[in-house]
């Protein structure tokens, strides 16, 4: 609060017009395009879809909702085989039932979908790039509501778009909510509707390059200039 009195403005990713009595300059979380490679263009395969979630996994990522939905999907005959790949460290608390969410292991065992949920562990650089190249659709945060958050501009959403992959999330992100390659799902505890996700993906006709180009305004250069020009 004391520092706010001695600056011209406060730069924020939020929607607040004033913070600690000082005016704000609203920008978005930026993207360093030079450090994020564009994924390869894949021919659309109607018989198999590979989903990819990349995170240091916590309960607010809500991957249990995706696994639950996948289990329900496979309870009936499936024309499209769907795999869920998870790349990143996973807290032990996420693997078993907790006060926050059902455990991954419990859900996988309940539905007998062991071969459809693949844990890759932490991947970086070329190994991570290869996972993106083989993926069709990415999984963002599906449970930010569990930590009391609605509006947020996550780096992961921006990385997905910069790589050129369509994705799903449940929070409010003004930079992406109306993008044609975004599937929004309810911010609640319901299982993710895999059939809806499949339909959305199959009807989508956007190349990785077009997805990436849609967020050129989110480069750090553009966002920094926005802050400077509003001083």
Map each language-model feature to its residues.
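Carbohydrate-associated surface elements
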Residues: 16, 30
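A charged, aromatic-enriched C-terminal amphipathic alpha-helix characteristic of glycosyltransferases
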Residues: 189-192, 202-231
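Conserved donor-binding/catalytic core segment of Leloir-type glycosyltransferases
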Residues: 42-61, 66-70, 84-87
